[in-house]
Amino acid sequence: DGAFELNMIGQDTTNWGRDIGDDRGLVGLLTELNNTVARHGSGWVRLMYAYPTNFDDEMIDTIASLDHIAKYIDIPLQHMSDNMLTAMRRGLLRKEQEDLMYRLRERIPGLAIRTTFITGFPGETEDDHQQLLEFVREFQFDMMGVFKYSHEDGTVAATMEDDPKLRVPEEVKERREEELMLAQQEVAWANADYLAEEGAVFDVLIDEREHQREVTEEDVALPTYQGRCYHQAPEVDSITLVASKHELAPGELVRCRIVGAAEYDLIARPVSDLERSTSLPVLGGSSGGCSA
């Protein structure tokens, strides 16, 4: 039907098929999806909500080897303190999660990792929070979200929260959330600036025309579009603003050079717009003068 992108979403995509007796598992599903996309020509499949539990080497090798599986994983870790991981009944401890994160980066070149954490879970101490904060600064996730724990009736956590000694005050939750997001902001903004400084080239999937922000070249406003590189999932991650001299269409894949950054977002120009027609040998290229 002309779709270019497929986002796999579920409560736990890592363990896909186990509840319905499908022996293919996630590896088999990814392989079949990759082959289907290949038969249709182009596109990418993005893995979301992949729990770290049971994420084994075969899955890592499969993602690394398949051309149409985006080198992007959304893997909710929830915390990095053993105390909290045990209370949350996550089934893994910090060392296991940490080893998996570094193994993913080592064995899948160019992999973008997104994760989510919960702050203020009943019983979370300041030491638990500091362990998480330190890991966020150390590992430097490509994308990250933080959620404040909220009460859900009928859950074990809700029972824990009934104990005043375990309940985390709302103002403490807010402070911890802010500290985590500021740490991630520093990482994300630096990454965006680096890609702009290097003039990195990516294929950008165009989503829609951008009407709120404009990019100018020599004081002339260029038509601007919202798009995403492979490392940007829809709705939850940053975007790439593409300023083009030519009209672009949603669903179009455009090779672009990153020429600027606006906090989390990237600013790009189509490579074809930046090329100069000349019969002389030229080394390097020009990115034009762009501002947002």
Residues of each region from the PLM?
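Short acidic/polar active-site loop segments enriched in Thr and Asp
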Residues: 4, 43, 142, 147, ...
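Proteins enriched for Cys/Gly/acidic motifs involved in redox and nucleic-acid/cofactor modification
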Residues: 1-16, 73, 96-106, 130, ...
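Conserved SAM/AdoMet-binding glycine-rich loop
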Residues: 3-129, 137-138
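Short beta-alpha junctions and helix-cap segments that line functional grooves
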Residues: 59-60, 132, 242-244
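Short, glycine-/Ser/Thr-/acidic-enriched flexible segments
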Residues: 13, 52, 119-120, 151, ...
